[in-house]
């Protein structure tokens, strides 16, 4: 919880403790170093580089918790209220109400940033805030915060049977991370292939082989109905039981849930801010419909110059939009005109991407000769909507140029192969 009593007012208040909040605080400090800034987060600790919760902390023995802490308060002078929830926003009076568990406070702001991000989608389909889905069982993990990571890491040692439920972005990474520390990992996906909603069969077939070779057992067509945590009243806990909608139940020592995420828009909605496509609508300055209230990161629905109105739940967008929002909160006049990238590594393979990757779109694949690297284009009505750079590096600017040229009608489908040099697979 907060280490210092809250002031009655601040020049700038930031709700959320992720990367967007960190970047906004830094931008404010750079422009107006004497401004008072309050960052409010329900997390127990300050902002960290969240991608490493499923990447570096597991895959690199030299990466420590201290390494991924962003040092926001120390670097910017912002006051950090951890373990604190914002219960309401009143745009008309320019105030927020907070609850730290010890006290309820009303704080006035000059400008306000909503950088509340997204919460893991829980077993009942809602967004979770405590990482336990209401079961009270810390063997059921959602990897969102540093606390989640610490709890999971304490539970997992070599040979621990871990069920990863969900074959999407988080599930695919979590399986790799847990395998790296010697856990016995079973990956359960309702789909025919891991990441099958994003990647064509040429890639997902390869990934199936890689997971198997590394010792991760993939189970397809597994739709989880409910999870039985058993009797944990004794000194030793029984195994978790995962019960599918169809087929036999399976057991595990720990379950990691990767169902996707739910945007945290409740505060904005209750305050009467304009919502759009499940997120918070912002203009080119990242201002919301309420005066002096901005939004950045996952929840912000912005105008991508190449792809139109969208929200993006990846760290690059959080960093870039947080910086622009913070600059404008401090009196700047920057425009957010950016097409974010995202990235991941799956064992020895990796990728960067821009735009929409969906196998519901038309796909054009361009492979190197030994089929270890590719550039994959995703099209709707012959216009490129996304570019996947599979084991192909330093090509994101080129991918953005492809999106722009295709949108402008100066690049045909036949021109795509060879337009971005394919990597060598290294």
Model-derived segments and spans:
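Mid-to-C-terminal Rossmann-like scaffold of FAD/NAD(P)H-dependent oxidoreductases
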Residues: 2-3, 8-10, 299-395
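Beta1-alpha1 glycine-rich phosphate/pyrophosphate-binding loop at the start
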Residues: 2-79, 177-198
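Residue-level detector of alpha-helix initiation sites
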Residues: 14, 18-19, 44, 118-120, ...
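Short hydrophobic core segments
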Residues: 14-15, 107-117, 250-260, 322
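A Rossmann-like FAD-binding core segment of flavoenzymes
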Residues: 34-36, 77-103, 107, 181-284
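Glycine-rich dinucleotide-binding loop and its adjacent helix/turn
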Residues: 116-181
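FAD-site-proximal beta/loop scaffold in flavoenzymes
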Residues: 136-160, 234, 242-243, 249-319, ...
